[in-house]
């Protein structure tokens, strides 16, 4: 059973693990293993959106929930205008370039938004009408995606800032963003903002759809698949399918 300490520590640990692989294992956002992990996360996120989250939303809401899924898709499109697509591993780094603060803030907003519906689910764990069955899939979808994003961010931090301390400081701040969203979801009732949990989840589903489809089509050079990346995407999809029977 998931609980808030496990969720929060897992997200923080995933981001710091991404930074560790860059600093101590000399990995980067261009490393083959990282590209495969990104492809896997894209397949997983796309599958849980279609097989878990969207069916659950439409079971509780009318067709109008689709507007909020579209809103989430468009929000992510706007955020990527500032982030440069770092959410799906698309980042260009140059030695000693100035760190783009807008990118960091955009990525942070993205991470906070993702955490909010998970916090709603954790707070409503005893609610018989809550999305308990999808809490694990949403948690895993965010978690799997955090590691390659953290690797891309740490790569950019190292190239743009000569101070290792500052690089780790920025990464640690980013590691707290999704947990912050979880806490907001737990302690700030959606109703107090004139919303409900389904609307917030629908926005995140839209974000998932944008990121996962972009990952799938941009996961290799020249937008061409190779076999390993295709297999990684399929494994991500299959793992999401198995959650229906766990």
Segments (PLM) and residue ranges:
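Intrinsically disordered, metal-sensing/regulatory segments
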Residues: 1-246
């Amino acid at each position: 059973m998931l609980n808030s300490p496990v969720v929060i520590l897992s997200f923080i640990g995933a981001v710091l693990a991404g930074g560790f692989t860059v600093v101590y294992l000399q990995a980067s956002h261009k490393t083959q293993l990282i590209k495969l992990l990104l492809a896997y996360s894209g397949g997983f996120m796309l599958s849980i959106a279609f097989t878990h989250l969207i069916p659950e939303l439409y079971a509780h809401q009318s067709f109008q929930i689709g507007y909020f899924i579209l809103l989430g898709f468009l929000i992510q499109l706007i955020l990527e205008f500032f982030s440069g697509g770092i959410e799906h591993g698309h980042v260009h780094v140059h030695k000693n370039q100035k760190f783009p603060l807008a990118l960091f803030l955009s990525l942070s907003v993205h991470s906070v938004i993702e955490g909010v519906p998970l916090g709603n689910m954790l707070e409503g764990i005893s609610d018989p009408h809550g999305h308990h069955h999808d809490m694990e899939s949403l948690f895993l979808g965010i978690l799997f995606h955090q590691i390659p994003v953290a690797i891309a961010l740490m790569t950019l931090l190292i190239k743009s800032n000569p101070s290792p301390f500052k690089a780790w400081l920025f990464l640690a701040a980013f590691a707290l963003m999704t947990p912050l969203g979880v806490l907001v979801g737990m302690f700030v009732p959606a109703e107090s903002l004139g919303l409900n949990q389904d609307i917030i989840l629908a926005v995140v589903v839209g974000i998932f759809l944008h990121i996962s489809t972009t990952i799938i089509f941009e996961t290799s050079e020249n937008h061409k698949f190779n076999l390993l990346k295709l297999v990684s995407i399929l494994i991500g999809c299959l793992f999401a399918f198995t959650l229906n029977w766990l």
